[in-house]
Every structure is written in structure tokens, then in C-alpha cells.
Amino acid sequence: MTKVGLRIDVDTFRGTREGVPRLLEILSKHNIQASIFFSVGPDNMGRHLWRLVKPRFLWKMLRSNAASLYGWDILLAGTAWPGKEIGHANADIIREAAKHHEVGLHAWDHHAWQAHSGNWDRQTMVDDIARGLRTLEEIIGQPVTCSAAAGWRADQQVIEAKEAFHLRYNSDCRGAMPFRPLLESGKPGTAQIPVTLPTWDEVIGRDVKAEDFNGWLLNRILRDKGMPVYTIHAEVEGCAYQHNFVDLLKRAAQEGVTFCPLSELLSGTLPLGQVVRGNIAGREGWLGCQQIAGSR
């Protein structure tokens, strides 16, 4: 039996309103629990369009057929008009998710975090995280115990900023296994549970065809000797590609693969490491990457 942590990122208003209810229904039918990370502030994701001037981002948008993948409402959100606030407008959906799944903070403003957090000072970052956590806690009526940085934009500054909130774990980076990042003080910080597997948009049209993706991914999972963590998006697997996701769950069950919330991957003793800026194939710009203590 292979256990895989299932992380669901919810980036947008449409992903929350349309994608999450579909995913909740799918997961219920398959008796699966996951970790769902919500963006709760304004939906300004359309402001990423300026990144089309960057060749790597343009190529990613073209090979993943972004217009049909996400829809024009997502691609233009927050451009010609102020972005709609996601959280309170979809409070019933978020509360329903929290009844059955582990719920955490993705971001207050996903676009702002992904585009600007790398240049924020620590207090700005702390204030932004606090705003998101406060809003999510108001909605679900209980403390939030986990978070996942938008776009995996995380480094030492993010690690230090999140320590103020005493969360059970964060999932801010890409890597191979759960670990504890070393703080500036030299002490171990809050546990990190990295995403270990590629997302749909990182590999489609580059490493694999859409129709071959599920078999390709299951091969990766079955060959993984560590603790696999897979991320889906409410805007993708909950919308245009929900049938592909259902097929993945059916095929995974046949192969003895089970999915679980990320917290089930935590153990008593974790290795030490750091979160450093790096790059991965298929994703434009820097992101947080796991570095085991003592390695370079």
C-alpha cells in the first residue's frame, strides 16, 4: 500500500465557487480526505497576464492551453475591475470543506504573494499572513493549523515569518520528504511537508500528453521511495479536468495507492533542513526548494 498526501490549492473565486464543491463530491464518493488550502482575499489572478512577456511563462500558458484550462474569467480577474473577495462570498463552501477535510491558508491575495512577497519586509509578510488566517478562522469558526505558500514562493524570510503563528505544519516548498527547517536562531522550526510530485500544468505538453498523464503520474508515485505529496488545483481538476481526476483516483485504487491529508505524513522525528530559492522544470520563476542540512 502506497500512501500519498493529497493537497488541493484553491487560488480563485471561480475555483472556490465551482471547483471545490465538485471536488468535495468526488472525494466523498471515493472516501478520501485531503488538505485544502484556500485563498480568501481578493481574486486578482488576472494581473499575472503581464508575465506573458517572459518566454518561460508564455510557453507554459501555450502548452497547457491556459484559456480552456482556467477560463477567461480567471485569466482576467482583477485586471479591468477590482478583484472580488473570495472568502466571505463563499463561506458556506469553505465551511463545508472544513467539516470533512483538513483546511489551511493558501493566501490572502494569491497574486500579491506570488508576485511581490519575495520583496516584502518581514512585518509586511506577517501582517499579510495574519489577515488571511484571521479571515479563514472567522469563516470556519476554529483555529487554522496549517498553511501552504501561494506558488511555493517561500524562503528563509517566509519560514521565520510563519513561526509567529505556531501552526502544526506548513507546505511551502518542493522537495522529497517532511522536515524541520532551521531558524535563524539555530533552532528547528515548524514542520514542512514539501510537494514531491509535478503538477498537471508543469508537465503537460512538455513531458507527457494529457491522455497519458494519469499513467505517467502513477508510475512516479509507485517508484517514489519517500513520502509522495501531490497537488491538484480546484481550477483545473475541479473544473475542466475533473473527469481526469476521477480516472486517476480509480486507477490509483487499483494499484493500491491511497490518498490522505498532509498531516498524516508527520512523524515524531524529522530531519533538519532549509528552504532555499530554486527552480524546477515547467514552472516560471523561483520557488522554495528543500535543502537537507549539511547539503549544498
Swiss-Prot record:
The metabolic or biological pathway listed in the UniProt record of this protein is: Glycolipid biosynthesis; 4-amino-4-deoxy-alpha-L-arabinose undecaprenyl phosphate biosynthesis; 4-amino-4-deoxy-alpha-L-arabinose undecaprenyl phosphate from UDP-4-deoxy-4-formamido-beta-L-arabinose and undecaprenyl phosphate: step 2/2; Bacterial outer membrane biogenesis; lipopolysaccharide biosynthesis
Q: Which UniProt keywords apply?
A: Antibiotic resistance, Hydrolase, Lipid A biosynthesis, Lipid biosynthesis, Lipid metabolism, Lipopolysaccharide biosynthesis
- Please provide the Gene Ontology terms (biological process) for this protein: 4-amino-4-deoxy-alpha-L-arabinopyranosyl undecaprenyl phosphate biosynthetic process; lipid A biosynthetic process; lipopolysaccharide biosynthetic process; response to antibiotic
* One Gene Ontology molecular-function label: hydrolase activity, acting on carbon-nitrogen (but not peptide) bonds, in linear amides
The answer to whether the entry has keyword Cell inner membrane is no
**Boundaries of every NodB homology domain copy:** 2-260
SUPFAM superfamilies for the chain: Glycoside hydrolase/deacetylase
One cellular component term (GO) for this entry is: membrane
Q: Which reaction does it catalyse?
A: 4-deoxy-4-formamido-alpha-L-arabinopyranosyl di-trans,octa-cis-undecaprenyl phosphate + H2O = 4-amino-4-deoxy-alpha-L-arabinopyranosyl di-trans,octa-cis-undecaprenyl phosphate + formate
Signal sequence segment: none
Pfam families per the UniProt record, alphabetical:
Polysacc_deac_1 (PF01522)
Q: Which domain of life is it from?
A: Bacteria
The EC code for this enzyme is 3.5.1.n3
Q: Which family does it belong to?
A: Belongs to the polysaccharide deacetylase family. ArnD deformylase subfamily.
NCBIfam families hit by this protein: PRK15394.1 (NF011923)
For this protein, the record's HAMAP family field holds: ArnD
> What does it do?
Catalyzes the deformylation of 4-deoxy-4-formamido-L-arabinose-phosphoundecaprenol to 4-amino-4-deoxy-L-arabinose-phosphoundecaprenol. The modified arabinose is attached to lipid A and is required for resistance to polymyxin and cationic antimicrobial peptides.
The name this protein carries in UniProt is Probable 4-deoxy-4-formamido-L-arabinose-phosphoundecaprenol deformylase ArnD
Q: Which species is the source of this protein? A: Escherichia coli O17:K52:H18 (strain UMN026 / ExPEC)
Q: Which gene encodes it?
A: arnD
